[in-house]
């Protein structure tokens, strides 16, 4: 698993109206990103395209959360959850992520993630849950941190 370091501990704020969008191939390589995503993550679109999406993975995120995400979307189901991402400079930002498998002619061809700014109550709940999960004290079935 990729462990992106260093981290600064500084949270990057972004406008509430932003929608951070990426598309990946079936292996998780970024094939498209919008300007808002690139701006918040601190990369240019050219730097992002072709890179594995875990380029922005924050080390505080439990590996099990991403295992659940991949298991869900590979089955053709959508996934939603709170995600703490790492910026290029080590800062972080929280997103309420909705990941959807894209089908063409009945075949899974790519994934798209649309993210928006979560409520602070969602972030607090996710921080507590993920910290407990990283300590090994949260059951695998606990993933619903959205509402």
PLM region spans:
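Sensory/regulatory domains in signal-transduction proteins
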Residues: 3, 10-132
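Alpha-helical transmembrane segments and their helix-membrane boundary motifs
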Residues: 142-147
């Amino acid at each position: 698993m990729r462990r992106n370091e260093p981290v600064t501990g500084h949270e990057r704020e972004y406008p509430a109206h932003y929608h951070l969008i990426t598309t990946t191939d079936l292996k998780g390589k970024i094939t498209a990103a919008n300007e808002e995503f690139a701006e918040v993550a601190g990369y240019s679109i050219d730097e992002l395209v072709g890179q594995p999406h875990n380029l922005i993975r924050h080390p505080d995120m439990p590996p099990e959360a991403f295992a659940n995400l991949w298991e869900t979307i590979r089955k053709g189901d959508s996934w939603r959850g709170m995600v703490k991402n790492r910026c290029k400079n080590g800062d972080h930002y929280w997103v309420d992520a909705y990941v959807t498998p894209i089908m063409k002619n009945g075949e899974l061809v790519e994934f798209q993630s649309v993210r928006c700014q979560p409520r602070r109550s969602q972030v607090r709940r996710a921080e507590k849950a993920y910290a407990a999960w990283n300590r090994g004290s949260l059951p695998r079935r606990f993933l619903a941190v959205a509402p």
